Amino acid sequence: MSHSPAQLSASPSSVGDGDRLLRAARGEVVDRPPVWMMRQAGRYMAAYRELQSKYTFKQRCEIPELAIEISLQPFRAFAPDGVIMFSDILTPLEGMGIPFELVEQQGPIIDPPIRSQAQVEQIRLLEPEESLPFIKTILSTLRREVEGKATLLGFVGSPWTLACYAVEGRSSKDYAHIKSLAFTQPQVLHQLLSKLADSIARYVIYQIECGAQVVQLFDTWAGQLSPGDYETWALPYQKQIVDQVKARCPQVPLILYINGSAALLERVGKAGIDVFSLDWMSDMAEARARLGSLAVQGNLDPMVLLGSPKFIRQRTLEVIQKAGSRGHIMNLGHGVHHTTPEANVHHFFETVRQAAELLKAL
């Protein structure tokens, strides 16, 4: 595929130190915080929108040439320290016998939704190499492309969040169906979550074997649970994944992201993860104190990137200062908003790259 001069404006090789993110994820002190953005490959980029107009979302995720190109668009434009595979958290579900449809601007539709013991019993264990052959091509190619210049991230959905989609059948505001299942037929939901955890653990290990150096678990909707329910319905299945992955790949850092995690910060470390990805609704300094020795990722409000360059710089440096020098990966507290100007994203990345000098000048 051809690349316009604008896409080639940043030079990843010029920033060097391709393992900066990997080392920060292991809790090491680095020269500056590594930086990448959730949803950094996406609709805010003109280059992405051009492909979006020609190919379905499923095609963009599963045709290796497209997924590789989309993953590399922000790498060429902004030289982040982390490059994440372009995919979707629901991608492995079909290989488990849970078909879904991705509808533009609507999100995923799972019809029929999974709400009975009989349906749960039909779910099979994922065989990633058979069901997701494109993943190996995507990750192995990306690893070659970014080797020595950036850390390659894989990602998966965590069981509670995947179950939210499977049981609700679509995006939800109140999670009535899954909470009803939890509170009336708990054994059915526990069985579903355990099956999901075993398959997702396999998928994480497969991503690592294909080239991923760090893997992020998205349990986005676990923040919809009370602390007690989090310990019943989300935490054990996060841990089930982490335990299986660490038994096979002990050196690979695992990141956990939960949206709306403020009430859960003392609990998330029990999952055994290496890094907790913080949303923007918690103060970074307070969160670090509550998270203890865990490395942390985040947590700039994505909407800050709609502000002026001066405002973006100020708020970015505030987060970095509060996070301290050890075990911090700079990121947003959620995915970058699709209306964000690319120039503002560039300014955000440049601010982080210059953070040491800029903080000295304060």
Swiss-Prot record:
PROSITE patterns: UROD_1, UROD_2
Disulfide bonds: none
Reactions listed under catalytic activity: uroporphyrinogen III + 4 H(+) = coproporphyrinogen III + 4 CO2
Superkingdom assignment: Bacteria
Keyword vocabulary terms for this entry: Cytoplasm, Decarboxylase, Lyase, Porphyrin biosynthesis
EC number(s) recorded for this UniProt protein: 4.1.1.37
Pathway in which this enzyme or protein is active: Porphyrin-containing compound metabolism; protoporphyrin-IX biosynthesis; coproporphyrinogen-III from 5-aminolevulinate: step 4/4
Primary site of residence: cytoplasm
Keyword Cytoplasm: yes
GO cellular component, one term: cytoplasm
A Pfam family assignment: URO-D
One GO-annotated biological process of the protein: protoporphyrinogen IX biosynthetic process
Protein's cellular compartments: Cytoplasm
Site (Transition state stabilizer): 88
Residues reported to bind substrate: 39-43, 88, 165, 220, 334
NCBIfam families associated with the record: hemE (TIGR01464)
Role noted for this protein: Catalyzes the decarboxylation of four acetate groups of uroporphyrinogen-III to yield coproporphyrinogen-III.
Stated family: Belongs to the uroporphyrinogen decarboxylase family.
Family matches, as HAMAP family: URO_D (MF_00218)
Protein name, as recorded: Uroporphyrinogen decarboxylase
Gene: hemE
